[in-house]
Amino acid sequence: MKTHLLVVPSKKTEEVNWVKPLNNYLLSIYGNTLQYQDDINSLNKLRQDIRGVNADDTGLKLYYSYYSKLELIDLRIPFHDLNKSKKLQFEWFDSFSSLPYTQNSLAFEKANVLYNIGAILSRFAQFKYNESQQLNGPEGETAFKQSISMLQQSSGIHQFINKNFLHAPSQDLAQSTIKFLSKLMMAQSQEIFTLKVISGDLNQSKNSLIAKLCKSTSVLYEDCYNMINKNKKEGFKITNESYDGNDYEDDLDDDDCDDLEGFLERPEDTEDSDNRYVAAELDSSWISIIYFKYEYYKSLAYYFNGLHLDANRKYGDAIAYLTKSQEVLNGVHSSTLKQVSKGSGDVYELLDNYKYQKDAVTIRLNDLNKDNDLIYHDIVPNLVTLPEIKPMDSTKIIKLGDNAMFHEINEKNYNNFLVNVVPVNIHELSSYYSEEKSQYLRNEIDHFEVSNEEVSSVLEYLKLPKALVSIKESLRGTSSKGNTRNIDELLSQSVIDKVNEISSQYSNDIQRKNTIENSRKEIYQLIKFLTENNCQDDAIQLKKILYDASVSDTKLFALVDETYHQTLGKGIQSTEFKSLFKTVDNKSSNQDSEISLLDIIDDDDDDNTNQDKQIKNIEDYLNDLNNIKQAKFKLIEKLKKEIHNDDISDILVLNMKLKSTNEIKSIIFPEELKKFNPFTNELDKLITNEKSIIEQLKSRWNQLISNPQIKNLQTETNSKNRLIISQSEKIDQFYGNWLKYHNGLIAGEKFYNQLLDQFKNFRNNIDNQLNQGMRSLNIGQQFPTQPMLNRTQSSGLQSNYTGQSSISHSGSLSGQPSGGYNQPQPQQQQLQQQQQQQQQAQFSGAYNQQYSQPHGGYTQFQGYGQGQGQSQTGYQRQPPPPPPQLPPKQSMGSYNFATTLQQQQLPPQQQQQPQQQRTPQNESNLIYDNPSTYNPNMYNFFSSK
């Protein structure tokens, strides 16, 4: 079966130029319109193209694209500002009466564009329906489905116009007309679907379903027919219904539509009673076709319901419904059929269907009456008492927002048309919303950080996981036995480096110390030599130097403990060093612990198993806490990303004309922030789980450390740790003293070597001078057999080497003894004075400068720099030589300790200052000018008995 579909006529329009008004507005706002020229030109071209489109996909895309851009202009540009300089005039013609209507309202332009979209959809649906009747197979099925979809979309377009555009200036845009067209599209969609089912039910197994579908189609056409003015219907003699006198009067005037804002009023306004009738001038064929279909499908509903009852052996009811169907068909007035025939297109299909159905009902009814009279004798109910058939709707309206083609085009235009044009108030609202998001994120981050701090505090208080690792090592026997762990695992790297440095220098330190002691002994032997050779002054000075050096050596050696130094000197891998870190229990209770373990080995196995389980549980809790921490971190990072990428400018633009600023802030913003609630809920869930794990961890940990064996292990571990800390501090302290000790040994070794070398040279000079003096006696070569001098001569010679000996501590001789020896030549005297000055400079600064190290090694020797001043003038020969006399004992103040201590506190430069001022010309201070207080035993104090 095939039907005739009514097509909504399209509206015609005049040309509109968008270029100049848009350029003027954008230039006034942004100062440059170069980047918007493509968008403006494309909009203007679309406006021209829609004037002559065909009813196909291309025409629909052009109209959808133009309407989408109109919506974007309405959202992004205040249209009243756009119309200030040069107003846009939109002229459209009524689709039924062809009357022109002109307005400068953007809403008027959008409403007319939408109307034409609905008209194109209805025409395109008719084309697809006719195509489906000509094609077979999948292609015909696809065309049929597209036809139904387009009729539903057209109904949705008209419904959108009805809800969003009120007080239209033209009759075709009036609310009543739009409602009528929307209902008509739904009726035609239901109709072609019903006919499709009838054509497919060759076995007549769906008569009940078809009856309900036909009833729904009849109801829809009835609604459309009831929306037509009674005066128009009476002209065709197709109704007998009473008329209440409230005829629809179309007295709208163009002047009544000057209010542009009124065109955008919401549909909540109360409808006037006159708006129930169609305002448009409908064609007479439309009215007759709608009425015909209303009656025709009502008849079909009765007919198929009768067939259904006949199949169920309800012959009386079947005869009643067939009779009802026949009455409806016979009730169609001939004038109606005549008006239908005047319609355009394939209206003859309707008349053919009518004739066929009328004959089919008559034949079927006659056969059924005959069978009932002869065979069934079923009672035929009264037609008035027949129950009405329940309608079944098979189609639904497809809204504009659900239109796939429009949605795709709208998304494309939104991202490409006037993208950077955003109203200032939208920017302000976006900034406010960004602050709301930032505050939301800060709250969640604070929640996250506080939870992490709580976990860290708990773990720090419980000393986890470090304490757990210590317990595990203790249970495995690696922590309770200090000697089983490598020593480098117990100590810090700095302590190990210090011990390695001490051990690497230990042999050198011992060698230097022995060298110092041996040198001191050898120098002591030199003192005996000087005493035996009557060089008492030099022996005294040398003893003084040696005494001060010994005192300094004693202080230096006292810096380190030899036993501890020996232990560290053997290195960190030595047994002695490792023994420093053994606790008392390790040293004294090994045997007892072994016996205890052998006695209670079975109990220990059970305890260890239980402890291992507890430790495993605690490790699992710690691992869970770490996983939760990572999950929280990832969740916060994801929340940051989502908040950063969130942009509700589109929503703000769409709602700016519908809601006030306060409504947007109080309603839309909280609603938009709810999209982040899943992150908040997940974070709360993780933190709650985290707190539960912490409580369980505390319980398990307290249970573990309350075990007596664990307590003992912790006690031993704490003792071990304290011992390690104590020994590390002791090593650090020892290392500081050892640096002074090590540097002092280096300086002392050098000093003693120089001192020993000088006095060895001095002894050699004495031997050479004695030999030279003996040769000057002209006794020949028999030096050992020379006759002894008499006591007077011997006394005079002794006085020359004791009282008047001016040999300095440097070890050089500056003159010959008085008593008959040959006088030295002037050249020899000059050479001896140079040697004396050089040796004096060496001894005055060598030890003091080299022995005083930055680390506090050797201190300055007392009295060493004082003996030099007197020795510089001792070897001046005075003619005639006076008797040898020693100065008074109190004149040896240059050797007392008070003076040397005072001089020791001065810098080396100031200590040498008085020595440099003394010259050989100061003869009044020589020991020879003082009265003799010689005591032969006064020098025996330092001599060995």
UniProtKB/Swiss-Prot annotation:
Recorded GO CC terms: endosome; ESCRT III complex
**Where is the stretch described as Disordered?**
786-945
**Entry-linked CDD domains:** BRO1_ScBro1_like, V_ScBro1_like
In this chain, composition skew of type Pro residues spans: 878-887
Signal peptide: which range, if any? none
GO biological process terms, semicolon-separated: cellular response to lithium ion; late endosome to vacuole transport; protein targeting to vacuole; protein transport to vacuole involved in ubiquitin-dependent protein catabolic process via the multivesicular body sorting pathway
Q: Which UniProt keywords apply?
A: Coiled coil, Cytoplasm, Endosome, Protein transport, Transport
List, alphabetically, the Pfam families matched.
ALIX_LYPXL_bnd, BRO1
**Primary place of residence?**
cytoplasm
For the keyword Transport, the answer is: yes
Is the keyword Coiled coil in the record? Answer: yes
Q: Where is the BRO1 domain?
A: 4-455
Where does it live in the cell?
Cytoplasm; Endosome
Compositional bias segments (type: Low complexity): 803-877, 899-921
Using the record for this protein, list the coiled-coil segments as residue ranges, or answer none.
606-643
Q: Which residues lie in Polar residues bias regions?
A: 786-802, 922-945
Regarding protein family, the annotation reads:
Belongs to the BRO1 family.
* Stated role: Involved in concentration and sorting of cargo proteins of the multivesicular body (MVB) for incorporation into intralumenal vesicles.
- Xref: PANTHER family: PCD6 INTERACTING PROTEIN-RELATED (PTHR23030), TYROSINE-PROTEIN PHOSPHATASE NON-RECEPTOR TYPE 23 (PTHR23030:SF30)
Any idea what this protein is called? Vacuolar protein-sorting protein BRO1
The protein's organism comes out as Candida albicans (strain SC5314 / ATCC MYA-2876)
Q: Which gene encodes it?
A: BRO1
